[in-house]
Regions:
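Short beta-to-alpha loop/turn elements within the nucleotide-binding domains of ABC transporters
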Residues: 1, 18, 47, 60, ...
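Nucleotide phosphate-binding site architecture
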Residues: 4, 12, 21, 53-54
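Short beta->alpha transition motifs characteristic of CBS
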Residues: 8, 32, 36, 42-58, ...
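The conserved cystathionine-beta-synthase
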Residues: 13-31, 38, 71-91, 95-98
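Histidine- and aromatic-rich ligand-binding microenvironments
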Residues: 19, 51-52, 64-65
Length: 109
């Protein structure tokens, strides 16, 4: 069972011009604690609800934080992905191609 067989593309992604307020609303709507941040189609990092809540101005744009960037290749085994999700306490894990292109995410569910 490879990760690529479990990718969901229904998870919204963030861009650097999105506001913290917008990101928090998406997290609430999708019941997630993390969302991937992309630059064009390249995965940059995982933005957490905790980090967004710590920002002094929720109407400010997210910018280009590269704080925490866990991801897994589409060709890795599903058990590796689940181990990463558990180890880091993630609500989702971004899946990337060999060249770093964001393909989607897998969730605990």
């Amino acid at each position: 069972m490879l990760v690529k067989d479990f990718i969901t593309k229904e998870i919204p992604v963030l861009k650097s011009f999105d506001t913290a307020e917008y990101a928090l609303a998406l997290m609430e709507d999708f019941k997630l604690k993390h969302l991937p941040l992309l630059s064009d189609s390249a995965y940059q990092c995982l933005v957490s609800e905790k980090d967004l809540l710590a920002l002094p101005d929720p109407s400010a744009t997210i910018g280009e934080p590269v704080l925490f960037a866990p991801a897994i290749s589409e060709n890795r085994h599903l058990h590796e992905a689940l181990a990463m999700i558990t180890r880091y306490g993630l609500s989702l894990l971004p899946v990337v191609s060999v060249d770093g292109t964001y393909l989607g995410a897998i969730t605990r569910d």
